[in-house]
């Protein structure tokens, strides 16, 4: 089954892969898909989301005119971080040492296509020890909503990430932990 999501955010390219707010938000769904499908997931990243294809093509053309005597690797220095350029050129099947003034219109179009859809293969998630948020835990069906007391065990209360709830990044999970902790603690104190 195909699954897609159009989201806009800042991504972070790290030594182990991609990270950042949107990656963290997608990680629960991606982890479930990886587990269910037993196959890698292809992520397409628009490296220039503020520009339409046509505007990006014009921008690349201007840069290529400015750096016409440079190698392709150096002719893209104003467009991308230096360490990302070889990755993009590799996906566009372009030689980084090729002079910019020898890039054909078709090659330039292929480059823009990669800039608008860099393909990254997701092979897994980071280990639990590195998790910022975890999914899973005690089902909310087994918990009294106002007191956070167990419906199955008298005197047992739950709070935070032991409960099967999780939210997007941005403090929602911390707020859930604080609020459920307060509610469970207050209820337990008055038991």
Q: PLM features: what roles do these ranges have?
A:
Residues 19-22, 138-139, 162, 169-173:
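Gly/Ser/Thr-rich beta-alpha loop segments that engage phosphate groups in nucleotides
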Residues 86-166:
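A glycine-rich dinucleotide-binding beta-alpha-beta segment and adjacent secondary-structure elements
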Residues 1, 5-102:
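An anion/pyrophosphate-binding glycine-rich loop and adjacent beta-alpha core
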Residues 11-16, 156-158, 181:
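Short hydrophobic core segments
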Residues 23, 27, 86, 109-112, ...:
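Predominant activation on well-ordered alpha-helical scaffold segments within soluble catalytic domains
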Residues 165-191:
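A conserved FAD-binding loop/helix module that cradles the flavin
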Residues 14, 125, 134, 169, ...:
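Ser/Thr-centric signal marking residues that sit
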């Amino acid at each position: 089954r195909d699954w897609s999501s159009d989201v806009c955010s800042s991504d972070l390219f790290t030594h182990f892969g991609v990270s950042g707010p949107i990656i963290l938000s997608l990680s629960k769904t991606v982890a479930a898909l990886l587990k269910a499908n037993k196959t890698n997931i292809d992520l397409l990243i628009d490296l220039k989301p503020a520009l339409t294809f046509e505007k990006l093509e014009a921008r690349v053309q201007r840069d290529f005119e400015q750096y016409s005597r440079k190698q392709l690797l150096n002719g893209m220095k104003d467009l991308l971080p230096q360490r990302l350029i070889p990755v993009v050129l590799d996906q566009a099947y372009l030689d980084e040492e090729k002079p910019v003034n020898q890039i054909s219109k078709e090659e330039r179009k292929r480059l823009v296509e990669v800039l608008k859809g860099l393909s990254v293969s997701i092979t897994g998630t980071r280990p639990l020890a590195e998790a910022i948020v975890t999914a899973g835990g005690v089902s909310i069906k087994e918990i009294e909503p106002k007191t956070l007391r167990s419906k199955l065990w008298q005197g047992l209360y739950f709070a935070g990430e032991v409960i099967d709830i999780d939210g997007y990044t941005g403090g929602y999970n911390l707020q859930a932990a604080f609020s459920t902790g307060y509610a469970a603690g207050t209820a337990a104190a008055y038991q």
